[in-house]
């Protein structure tokens, strides 16, 4: 077995310099390579350790790392961001071995940075933080490609003070997520603290430090067996499926183990389940030294060994979804076994149950897995989760789910378009569709919407329930003795409304027909109000009820239980007092 280079993903908020940082790292690799040393990949940039040593020589010596690094180098995923990270999935973990979370040192951790951080944590991937835009620290004196440890020694005190303040703010932000972090040269225990490396993607300062810290973290925290590559059928993950002129539909794949050969049978997965096909062509970029014509950048190869990024040309790749596993089969007797393996793997991501919960949709297996994981962590139950745009069935399932809980009548759509006919059907069925490209925004919108639904639902329930109330007939304010009786009253506790039934000593005396205040009808009267009420019932004031009598609002038994055990918080103190007194009277 040989040792492969670890896969590294760069993540972070928009405009923090992820792409520029990647470009700087790639440029470093090209500039300091030995002739013929750089192997080109599809979707991946290889940075050999020898190039890092050449670039960061003085810092390598200062940190005493020369001769101690056994990894061949790094394989940087060319596309930064959480979508690429999500698609680098494998059963039980991630194909990504390391992550760099890029943060703008001048503004700290931002929204998508938080999303990236939680995604990294959910997959258990070791990571370091690049505190980028070091060149924007007020008063900072930049020198191109200088290591940070050497640069900081040459700065004025006010620039260092500004830097320390920015790093301190970032450390505080990270602590809110349970992460202990510090500037990398101050970290005492890398198993407990996350290193922060100040960098500038513009000047190249700190890039050397970043690569050396990455090497140290990789050797310390990535199990050697995870980086061991066997000579056997290839194992990989689909990163992108697209149509290429002259080739048809192709799949860009990351191989993390084994060997893939032209003519191999491969098993992967689409929306409808496992797919079997045969490799017609394997395409790799030409070596840099041979790349003369920009239009002639690629070449066909007979085989590719992991770890690598390769483009596969094969029949039947349309419908294959990014994030799907891909396995080569050398012994044809193993095909059904591998098909079952793929089926089991995607069934762990896709969800179809009769339980209560929301409907989840995402564009790839990777993003769906991240979405499901995140929703479960937030305590949101899922009834159905699948890859691709929402369908008629999703709307039907959402309607069924809503019957059990109104907040589950929703489709959460991550990175997918909504077909117009599905949108119309959802609207007519009263099903909410929340679509977005940032998972946390979808979740936040769902929480906001579900709270509105809960509030509206509770308001509807409460509007149909009878609130407790206690009144006293005011002496000298009998305006009519019967048919209906009209009297002046004071609300001693609770609330009264037209339509409620009044009781005296546990016996019903009549129903309030109307409430008037200052000669005008009102919808309700609350504690402290003095109003006139008309009472419909077989009563005469002076017989069944008298001046000075205390009457209570009749509350049905089921509603009493609801008020006490479900909606107690919606009762005012005086309403609760009226209910408790009413219960005591009933027990006499």
From Swiss-Prot:
Residues 132-135 are annotated as: G4. Keywords: GTP-binding, Initiation factor, Nucleotide-binding, Protein biosynthesis. Residues 200-202 are annotated as: G5. Residues 37-41 are annotated as: G2. Residues 78-81 are annotated as: G3. GTP binds at residues 12-19, 78-82, 132-135. The keyword GTP-binding applies. It comes from the Archaea. One of its GO terms (molecular function) is GTP binding. InterPro entries: EFTU-type (IPR029459), P-loop_NTPase (IPR027417), Small_GTP-bd (IPR005225), T_Tr_GTP-bd_dom (IPR000795), TF_aIF-2_arc (IPR004544), TIF_IF2 (IPR015760), TIF_IF2_dom3 (IPR023115), TIF_IF2_dom3_sf (IPR036925). The keyword Membrane does not apply. GO terms for cellular component: cytoplasm. Function in general translation initiation by promoting the binding of the formylmethionine-tRNA to ribosomes. Seems to function along with eIF-2. NCBIfam families: aIF-2, PRK04004.1, small_GTP. Belongs to the TRAFAC class translation factor GTPase superfamily. Classic translation factor GTPase family. IF-2 subfamily. This is Probable translation initiation factor IF-2. The lineage of its organism: Archaea, Thermoproteota, Thermoprotei, Thermoproteales, Thermoproteaceae. The gene is infB.
């Amino acid at each position: 077995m040989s040792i492969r280079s670890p896969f590294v993903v760069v993540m972070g908020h928009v405009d923090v310099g992820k792409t520029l940082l990647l470009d700087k790292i790639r440029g470093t690799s090209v500039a300091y390579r030995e002739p013929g040393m750089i192997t080109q990949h599809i979707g991946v940039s290889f940075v050999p350790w020898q190039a890092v040593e050449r670039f960061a020589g003085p810092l390598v010596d200062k940190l005493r790392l020369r001769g101690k690094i056994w990894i061949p180098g790094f394989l940087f995923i060319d596309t930064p961001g959480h979508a690429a990270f999500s698609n680098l999935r494998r059963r039980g973990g991630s194909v990504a071995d390391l992550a760099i979370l890029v943060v703008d040192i001048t503004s700290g951790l931002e929204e998508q940075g938080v999303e990236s951080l939680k995604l990294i944590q959910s997959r258990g991937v070791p990571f370091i933080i690049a505190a980028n835009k070091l060149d924007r620290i007020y008063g900072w004196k930049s020198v191109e490609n200088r290591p940070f440890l050497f640069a900081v020694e040459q700065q004025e005190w006010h620039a260092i003070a500004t830097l320390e303040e920015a790093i301190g703010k970032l450390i505080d932000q990270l602590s809110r997520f349970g992460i202990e972090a510090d500037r990398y040269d101050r970290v005492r225990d890398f198993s407990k603290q996350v290193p922060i490396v100040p960098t500038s993607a513009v000047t190249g300062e700190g890039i050397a430090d970043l690569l050396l810290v990455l090497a140290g973290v990789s050797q310390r925290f990535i199990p050697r067996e995870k980086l061991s590559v066997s000579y056997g059928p290839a194992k990989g993950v689909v990163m992108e499926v697209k149509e290429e002129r002259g080739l048809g539909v192709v799949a860009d794949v990351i191989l993390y183990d084994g060997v893939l050969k032209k003519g191999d049978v491969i098993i992967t997965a689409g929306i409808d389940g496992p797919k079997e096909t045969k490799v017609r062509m394997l395409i790799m970029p030409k070596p840099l030294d041979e790349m003369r014509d920009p239009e002639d950048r690629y070449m066909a190869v007979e085989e590719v060994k992991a770890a690598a990024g390769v483009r596969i040309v094969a029949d039947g790749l349309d419908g294959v979804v990014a994030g799907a596993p891909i396995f080569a089969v050398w012994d044809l007797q193993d095909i059904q076994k591998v098909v079952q393996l793929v089926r089991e793997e995607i069934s762990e991501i896709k969800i179809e149950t009769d339980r209560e919960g929301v409907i989840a949709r995402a564009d790839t297996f990777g993003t769906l897995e991240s979405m499901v994981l995140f929703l479960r962590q937030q305590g949101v139950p899922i009834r159905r989760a699948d890859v691709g745009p929402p369908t008629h069935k999703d709307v039907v399932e959402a309607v069924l789910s809503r019957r059990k809980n109104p907040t589950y009548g929703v489709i959460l759509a991550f990175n997918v378009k909504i077909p117009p006919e599905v949108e119309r059907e959802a609207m007519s069925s009263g099903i909410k569709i929340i679509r977005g490209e940032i998972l946390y925004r979808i979740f936040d919108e769902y929480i906001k919407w579900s709270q509105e639904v809960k509030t509206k639902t509770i308001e509807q329930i409460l509007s149909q329930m009878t609130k407790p109330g206690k009144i006293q007939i005011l002496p000298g304010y009998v305006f009519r003795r019967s048919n209906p009786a009209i009297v002046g009253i004071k609300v001693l506790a609770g609330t009264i409304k037209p339509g409620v039934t009044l009781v005296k000593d546990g016996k019903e005396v009549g129903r309030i027909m109307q409430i008037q205040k200052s000669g005008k009808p009102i919808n309700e009267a609350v504690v402290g109000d003095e109003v006139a009420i008309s009472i419909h019932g077989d009563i005469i004031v002076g017989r069944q009820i008298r001046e000075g009598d205390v009457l209570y609002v009749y509350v049905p038994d089921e509603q009493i239980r609801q008020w006490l055990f479900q909606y107690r918080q919606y009762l005012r103190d005086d309403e609760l007092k009226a209910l408790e007194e009413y219960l005591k009277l009933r027990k006499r």
